[in-house]
C-alpha cells in the first residue's frame, strides 16, 4: 500500500471541537504532552483509584515520568493532553495500532489507528463527555490518515463503563483478546460510523 507523504497521522494539533459543531460543553483541543508542565497532573490522575483500577499505573512520580518519556520517544505513538476551554482534563495516547505490539493479538490492518483515553478530574467523568470526546478524537484520527480505515481500542474487558462509552462514540465490541497484562475488549470504529 503506498504511503501518503506530507501527512502525519499522529499530528492532531490545530483541531478544535466546539459546542456548536460537536456537542462538547466548551472548546476542546489537544496539545502535546509537556513533561515539565504536565508530570504532576498526570501523576495525580494516574494515582486516582478509579483511573488506577484500569490503567494500572498508580506509581511514584519518577516511574510515571519514565513511562511518559517512553511515550514521547515512541515512533508510533504520540501522547497528548486534552484541554476543555484551555484547562487540562484528559490524557490521550494516539498511536498506529498496526505498528504496536498489540498487532500480534488481533487481525491488524495496515494504518489501523489506536487510542487510549484517560479523563483526569473526577468531575470530567460521566455526563457523556467521554463518549463525545472519543467520537471527536477518533474522527480526527481517521481524517488525519486517509489510509486508515478504522480506530482500535482495547480497554480492560471488565471496564464495562468504558465499553458503553465507546459504543456511544461509534465503536463496536468485536471480541475479547488475551494480552500479556489483561483480557481486553477489542473495540473498532470504522469510517462507516463517521
Language model segments and positions:
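A short glycine-rich, hydrophobically flanked beta-strand micro-motif that places a catalytic Asp/Glu
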Residues: 78-81, 151-153
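An amphipathic alpha-helix signature
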Residues: 39-43, 65
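Short, contiguous pre-domain boundary segments
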Residues: 19-27
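A short beta-loop-alpha structural element at the N-terminal edge
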Residues: 29-40
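Helix-loop element at the rim of GNAT/NAT acetyltransferase active sites that forms part
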Residues: 44-58
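Active-site rim helix/loop that mediates acceptor-substrate recognition in acyltransferases
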Residues: 58-79
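Acyl-donor (CoA/ACP) binding surface of acyl/acetyltransferases
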Residues: 1-6, 10, 21, 38-39, ...
Amino acid at each position: 500500500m503506498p504511503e501518503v507523504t506530507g501527512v502525519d497521522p499522529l499530528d492532531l494539533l490545530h483541531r478544535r471541537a466546539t459546542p456548536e459543531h460537536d456537542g462538547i460543553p466548551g472548546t476542546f483541543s489537544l496539545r502535546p504532552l509537556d513533561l515539565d508542565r504536565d508530570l504532576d497532573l498526570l501523576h495525580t490522575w494516574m494515582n486516582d483509584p478509579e483511573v488506577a483500577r484500569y490503567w494500572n499505573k498508580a506509581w511514584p512520580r519518577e516511574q510515571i515520568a519514565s513511562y511518559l518519556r517512553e511515550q514521547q520517544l515512541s515512533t508510533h505513538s504520540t501522547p497528548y493532553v486534552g484541554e476543555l476551554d484551555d484547562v487540562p482534563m484528559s490524557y490521550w495516547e494516539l498511536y498506529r495500532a498496526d505498528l504496536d505490539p498489540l498487532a500480534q493479538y488481533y487481525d491488524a490492518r495496515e494504518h489501523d489507528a489506536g487510542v487510549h483515553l484517560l479523563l483526569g478530574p473526577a468531575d470530567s467523568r460521566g455526563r457523556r463527555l467521554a463518549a463525545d470526546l472519543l467520537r471527536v478524537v477518533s474522527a480526527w484520527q481517521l481524517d488525519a490518515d486517509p489510509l486508515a480505515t478504522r480506530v482500535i481500542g482495547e480497554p480492560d474487558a471488565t471496564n464495562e463503563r468504558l465499553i458503553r462509552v465507546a459504543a456511544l462514540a461509534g465503536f463496536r465490541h468485536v471480541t475479547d483478546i488475551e494480552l500479556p497484562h489483561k483480557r481486553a475488549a477489542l473495540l473498532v470504529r470504522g469510517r462507516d460510523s463517521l
